[in-house]
Amino acid sequence: MSQTCQTGYAYMQPFVQIIPSNLSLACGLRILRAEDYQSSLTTEELISAAKQDAEKILADAQEVYEQQKQLGWQAGMDEARTLQATLIHETQLQCQQFYRHVEQQMSEVVLLAVRKILNDYDQVAMTLQVVREALALVSNQKQVVVRVNPDQAGAIREQIAKVHKDFPEISYLEVTADARLDQGGCILETEVGIIDASIDGQIEALSRAISTTLGQMKVTE
């Protein structure tokens, strides 16, 4: 056993610490008390436990950091998906607005062109053509009353015979003035119902057909 003399003060008496390769006894101490050695061991255990606790705290902190890092990444991805969905929705709305605008413009252009062409025709001749087409729909009726614009009623009466001869099934055909109708207006009254064959009505039907066609094109796309 070797003896090392050191000067110092501690909360307990100097003692010998047993180390496998070395055993040293404090200066002036010949006997190692059991309680002193046990106290030394307890102190070392506390230090060791403290180190383990510190290591565990560091490990837990690292784990929490990784978890928060993963949560941050996931939150970023969720935010990106939300932003993407918002942009897609806004783009779809803009496309719908654009299509509606184009649809309205196309419809207006087509209808304007049709009206311009119709205005170049003789209005009485055009009304007679409308009457002819309407009579074809009710040719199985015996009696038909044709209502037209008052300004055209006289001219239509003078020429209605030319149209009537193509529909011999109709035994009675009368032309009467109706102030509610514009030029080109034509309403046929029969025993089973009324048919509005006015040019304005046909143009409106054309407008609806254009809108329907454009709507189907958008769905297909």
UniProtKB/Swiss-Prot annotation:
* Chief site of localization: cytoplasm
Q: Does the keyword Plastid apply?
A: no
A biological process (GO) of this protein is: protein secretion by the type III secretion system
Query: Could you confirm whether the keyword Protein transport appears in this record?
Result: yes
What GO CC annotations are associated with the protein?
cytosol
Quote the InterPro entries the UniProt record gives: Flagellar_FliH/T3SS_HrpE, T3SS_SctL/SctL2, T3SS_Stator/FliH
Q: Which Pfam families match?
A: FliH
What keywords is this UniProt entry annotated with? Cytoplasm, Plasmid, Protein transport, Transport, Virulence
What the record says about the induction of its expression is: At 37 degrees Celsius in the absence of calcium.
Subcellular location per the Swiss-Prot or TrEMBL entry: Cytoplasm
* Domain of life of the organism encoding this protein: Bacteria
Subunit details: The core secretion machinery of the T3SS is composed of approximately 20 different proteins, including cytoplasmic components, a base, an export apparatus and a needle. This subunit is part of the cytosolic complex. Interacts directly with YscN/SctN (T3SS ATPase) and YscQ/SctQ (the major sorting platform component).
Known role: Component of the type III secretion system (T3SS), also called injectisome, which is used to inject bacterial effector proteins into eukaryotic host cells. Acts as a regulator of the YscN/SctN ATPase activity.
> Per the similarity annotation, which family is this?
Belongs to the SctL stator family.
Protein known as: Type 3 secretion system stator protein
